[in-house]
A protein has these predicted regions:
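His/Glu-rich zincin catalytic helix
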Residues: 2-101, 125-128, 138
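Acidic/histidine-enriched segments that form metal/cofactor-coordinating
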Residues: 17-25, 29, 94-95, 99-178
Length: 178
């Protein structure tokens, strides 16, 4: 009886190894298929020097943004924090749009507007329907070129940024990787 149980156990192990190999093979095929289906990135340069990277995924949605090579690494003692500060101020309104108008326009498009600052870059981007890309580009251009920097908004954002800095400084992982 013990030999019979041992034989069944060995057969079960052999079967399970086979199942595991098939799972790995299928997983590898899925990864390979996914990598092969990533759309090619087309990089072009406009007459004004602006580089444009685009991909056609065939989806009805798009992400469009500005990746500016000016992050915290580009700062010095005199202008420390300016990239992060300007990122925060970008959505406070422009010469053409108040903050409320900007928010309503983006919301009515069903879009999402956001920004972030890293060591290398400051990024402003919009997620929207593909048909709304021209409007999203126009809004982003307006924000980058015509942001208003009102005294009350500056004071309010200053306290927000100082609070964010305290949160980062209290997170040991953030401090170590900084």
């Amino acid at each position: 009886m013990a030999l019979r149980v041992l034989g069944v156990t060995q057969n079960l192990r052999t079967y399970m190894r086979g199942v595991e190999i098939i799972k790995r093979y299928k997983s590898a095929l899925t990864v390979k298929k996914t990598l092969l289906n990533i759309p090619a990135t087309q990089v072009t340069q406009l007459d004004n020097g602006l580089r444009v990277a685009s991909e056609d995924s065939g989806a009805s949605t798009a992400t469009v943004g500005l990746w500016i090579d000016a992050g915290s690494r580009s700062e010095n003692d005199r202008n420390n924090g300016v990239a992060h500060f300007l990122e925060h101020m970008a959505f406070k309104g422009t010469d053409k749009r108040s903050q409320t108008d900007l928010e309503l326009e983006v919301e009515n498009m069903g879009a999402h507007l956001n920004a972030y600052t890293s060591r290398e870059q400051t990024v402003f981007y919009a997620k929207c329907l593909s048909k709304d890309v021209p409007k999203a580009v126009e809004i982003l251009a307006d924000i980058i070129q015509n942001s208003q920097l009102g005294e009350s908004e500056i004071a309010r954002e200053r306290s927000v940024i100082l609070r964010e800095m305290q949160e980062v400084e209290s997170n040991l992982q953030e401090v170590v990787f900084d």
